[in-house]
Structure formats: C-alpha cells, structure tokens
Design a protein with these regions (language model features):
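Cell-envelope and extracellular/periplasmic
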Residues: 1-206
C-alpha cells in the first residue's frame, strides 16, 4: 500500500525531489536493488509522504519562509511479518536511500536532516500474534536507526497512522499489535499521527 502514488508533479516540483535513479518516490517495491547516486530529480508521481512535503512547503511559502529541498522515498517488499520487513530488501534499499540523501546534500553543500520515517505496515503482517508484531516493529525501528547512524544521520522520529482496518477486516495481529506498540516501543520516538478512520479509505485499507 505504501508504494502507491498519484500523478505528479508536485506544486513545488523543484523542491519535492527523489534520488535521480529513474524510480521516483515509490521506490523499488522489492523488485530490485537501489543504485547509488548523488543527484536528485523531480517526482513523476506523488506518494502520501510527497503530498505532505508539498503541503509543508506551501505553508512555509504562506509564512514567507525559505523553501528547503525535500527528498522523499518509499521502500516496500513482500515481507509477510514485521520481523521479515526488518531484514529484507526494503530496509536494505532504504539504507542506500539515506546514503544517497547524504551524498546529494554534500554535492549541494548543505546539511541533510531526516524529518521523519513513516511506518506503514499493519494489515500485511501474518504472524497471528500481536506481541510478535510489536517485537518485529521495534526490531525494524532499531535496524533503521542503526542504518541511519552509519550514514551520519540523527535518530529519527517514526510516524504512523493508527490503522483501523477496512469494512471487512476489523481484527488482526497487526491491528491489535498497534496497541502493544503504542505503549511499548523501546527507546524509539514513535508517534501515531492520526487514526485511519479520520480519512476516506478504499476497500484495500488505503
């Protein structure tokens, strides 16, 4: 679900960017390996995160503030559990995404800062165990944090929507595991930004 995008470009097309690898904001989708690059390019399609970046820029312009460059990248794969997600292709490609961000910022002579890492993995988890889901997500956050540290980036804020399922899926290990994760997420900064029922949702929970 996280790899879906709507048609671009962004309103601030030269400020909402992705690595210049001809993949765009949606990432590899677990189908290949990301490539190293120190260049950036405008996005052809807009993920949820790209739309958020575009809105943040619009608000900064309304306040007559400077407009930074915002780099957006989603990475997904076919992991069946949260534990698998933390050891699979998506997180490996995310590591290279962080390295590309640092390389691009160095080329431009500016600093790199990660505003947030968005976690979007609930209905996909097939463990059947809410506690196993929680433990897998904690391990995933630890894996991402360590990867960012290797790239010289600070510990991130993790954002997630509190997934409430769909009209037909109202129970599940991931859905119930969110409650476990909300009160026990280790020493990571995890913020549930909003419940999914606050938004219009399609039949796939998107």
């Amino acid at each position: 679900r996280a790899g879906l995008g709507s048609t671009g470009p962004a309103r601030f097309r030269w400020h909402v960017l992705g690595p210049a690898d001809d993949i765009g904001a949606v990432g590899q989708g677990g189908e290949g390996e990301a490539v190293a690059t120190d260049a950036l390019e405008p996005l052809r399609e807009l993920t949820v995160e790209a739309l958020v970046a575009d809105e943040l820029l619009a608000r900064r312009r309304a306040e007559h503030r400077s407009l930074p460059l915002m780099v957006v990248r989603a990475e997904t794969d076919m992991a069946a559990t949260a534990h698998e997600l933390g050891t699979g292709a998506a997180v490996a490609n995310l590591d290279l995404g962080f390295a590309n961000l640092v390389a691009a910022s160095a080329r431009l002579g500016v600093g790199a800062q990660v505003l947030a890492v968005v976690l979007d993995y609930t209905l996909e988890d097939l463990t059947g165990d809410p506690v196993a889901y929680r433990d897998g997500m904690i391990a995933l956050m630890e894996r991402i944090t360590r990867g960012m540290a290797k790239a010289g980036l600070a510990r991130p804020i993790f954002l997630a929507a509190f997934d409430c399922g769909t009209q037909t899926v109202t129970r599940g290990p991931g859905l119930e595991g969110q409650w476990e994760l909300s009160w026990n997420h280790g020493d990571h900064r995890l913020v549930f930004a909003a419940p999914s029922y606050a938004f219009r949702v399609d039949d796939t929970g998107r």
